[in-house]
Amino acid sequence: MTSSPTVNLLDLDAQGLVAYCDSLGEKPFRAKQLQRWIHQYNAADFDGMTDLAKSLREKLKGRATISMPGIVSDNISTDGTRKWLIDVGNSNAVETVYIPEETRGTLCVSSQAGCAVNCRFCSTGKQGFSRNLTTAEIIGQLRMAEFALRASRGIDGGRATGGDGKGERVVTNVVMMGMGEPLLNYDAVVPAMRLMLDDNAYGLSRRRVTLSTSGVVPMMDRLGADLPVALAVSLHAPSDPLRDMLVPLNKKYPLRELMAACQRYLKVAPRDFITFEYCMLDGVNDSEAQARELLALTRDVPCKFNLIPFNPFPESGLIRSKPEQIKRFAQVLMDAGVVTTVRKTRGDDIDAACGQLAGAVKDRTRLAERTGKAAKVIEVRAV
């Protein structure tokens, strides 16, 4: 007789845990207990789950695991940005980035090893697509970061959600803006985001979880029906010919379809605007005339713009827009009454800035020479 396969409980959201407990002959409330132990108390095994019946703990030992991906390296930038390189097996690695600010801490989470979209200005796409991450590998990034950050700040175990009312949560916002296109890994990303929102797990509000997409129109509609979180769209061009070149997915879902999908999404979104991300490329998409084209393109979509100075990498053949040109471009948008921000480049000395995530372990000597900046590197063993 063959034994049942072992289940990684990190792969299961609340509904999945209830179904799993039912398969063991257990009541639904056991699923909530398990979820709290795993996601709020960082339990690594079942022995310490003292409010579970011993018989259930014994069942779980033989049939389930709480398996996290391994950590290859842990780097801290001079500006406080922290990047983990995560081993997801078969020579694949993904990156997770924490960006601390005065009033919040934002975690940038990866959804795929590599990326098939292959945007011209993004180094991740240049490595090609390896595979989708599992739900465990996605939510595991938040679990790992939250408790690593708590430990580094001397915050004892306990609830990751700050449920004691003391506001102890370190990660206050999650952005699905790491490696990969989240909507092309929908079936793993959505359960992970459900866990991010679940009060028995991480308890984030829908306004504090943002999914960034290059514009997979049918899946935008599906997300709006299933789990509408805050939405960011990687726009980067005001016209189809230019966007076809910068974001090849545009050939399948052109701008007219994308703008219509944004309008539909706003009917159910937790925020009353879409964030359009726009990578500033010298002489490519940064003229004042193109800013006016953007205004015409998005006039029927309540939105804000996040202008992102391009972070160069050798294979791109592109150059970052000059600061004064970014300022002029932004002014055109702001003069029209559109909220516009220019993203401050963070973590570029550890290749953690926007567009730099490539999943490769780089030679740190050459990295330091190239950036002219120091990076604090913490070596950690796989867990």
Swiss-Prot record:
Its main location: cytoplasm. Its cofactor is [4Fe-4S] cluster. It is found in: Cytoplasm. S-adenosyl-L-methionine binds at G180, E181, S212, S234, L235, H236, N311. The keyword Kinase does not apply. Disulfide bonds join C108-C354. Its EC number is 2.1.1.192. Binds 1 [4Fe-4S] cluster. The cluster is coordinated with 3 cysteines and an exchangeable S-adenosyl-L-methionine. GO terms for biological process: rRNA base methylation; tRNA methylation. Residues 101-349 form the Radical SAM core domain. Keywords: 4Fe-4S, Cytoplasm, Disulfide bond, Iron, Iron-sulfur, Metal-binding, Methyltransferase, rRNA processing, S-adenosyl-L-methionine, Transferase, tRNA processing. It catalyses: adenosine(2503) in 23S rRNA + 2 reduced [2Fe-2S]-[ferredoxin] + 2 S-adenosyl-L-methionine = 2-methyladenosine(2503) in 23S rRNA + 5'-deoxyadenosine + L-methionine + 2 oxidized [2Fe-2S]-[ferredoxin] + S-adenosyl-L-homocysteine; adenosine(37) in tRNA + 2 reduced [2Fe-2S]-[ferredoxin] + 2 S-adenosyl-L-methionine = 2-methyladenosine(37) in tRNA + 5'-deoxyadenosine + L-methionine + 2 oxidized [2Fe-2S]-[ferredoxin] + S-adenosyl-L-homocysteine. [4Fe-4S] cluster binds at C115, C119, C122. Reaction proceeds by a ping-pong mechanism involving intermediate methylation of a conserved cysteine residue. Specifically methylates position 2 of adenine 2503 in 23S rRNA and position 2 of adenine 37 in tRNAs. m2A2503 modification seems to play a crucial role in the proofreading step occurring at the peptidyl transferase center and thus would serve to optimize ribosomal fidelity. This is Dual-specificity RNA methyltransferase RlmN.
